[in-house]
Amino acid sequence: MQIKRLRIDKHLCLVDFDIRFATVSGGSSTILIGENGAGKSTMIECILNILMSFDSPAIEKQIDYSYSLEYEYAQKSISIIKSGHAYRITADDSAIEGSYRKVRSFAQKNSLFPQRVVAFYSGTNNKLFPNIKVVNTRYTCLCRDTLRNFLKSMNDDSERFIPNFPKRKYNYCEEGFTPVYLLSILCGQKSFEKSYLIKACHFDKVKYVDMVVNTNKVEQIFGRGRFEGDVPTGLYYLTDFIDYRFTDLLRRGFMYSSNGKSYFQITNIDSVNIDSIAILEFFEKLYSLFETRFEVTVTQGESNVKCSEMSEGQRQLIKILGMLGI
């Protein structure tokens, strides 16, 4: 997606805001330079909210300003104009105008937006994450439904359809997810991100991953009280479906269960020879579905360093490399 022009009418510091972007055929990046308070973050927030508004009526209701957005995507020239409550969308030679509901249906049928959006904000006044969290609530619900449909297909001989997980469209790195990016990069295949991170931070490899799973969330998928004892057999059953290659690692890394949580210390993830994308997607499912929390310890020379104890600069680098590279 290449944005060509953005016009915003009277939103916070963006008053009669109109900016044209210099684009290069075949793809290009845009750098925003400006003084503090010039509206750089507000502009990025507006672009993100415009994209999310076509996935979430709740976010659309928050946009109380008129705007015009012109961009190129999938070899199409697209224009979206919002004036009050009226919309007009043009995609090459096709055009539609009317209410939000009408144009939203048109946009979804014609694939006018990217399938993956990555957002990153390193400042203190983070206005991006709350709305991304709202949109991703539906993603988490769809993942839970996928697990329940899987269980239904296993328990009903007439069900022959094995469901697939949806793809996460809006990606934003919460602080608690930084360790997952770290282990995905270091335990995955050879890549630019892996080489750069090792060289820049002098990391050697992942020594182990401490993981805590909320087993109450696991039992909610099955129905409470289905599994008894300390061993999280219900979790293993679900991870076999999510990605069976990780289940044995979890079994060997299991330590104990207490007060509705199961504790693991996982080693030798890189020995399984799984690529970074598969590692990320597996642990992201555990993070989103079962409130799993992680601590990754890496070797750095003769020392061991936890992800939570790394410098702010190292953690920001891990986020950027993970979100853009995997």
Tell me what each language-model feature is.
Residues 9, 20-22, 70-72, 81-83, ...:
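A structural detector for beta-sheet-dominated domains
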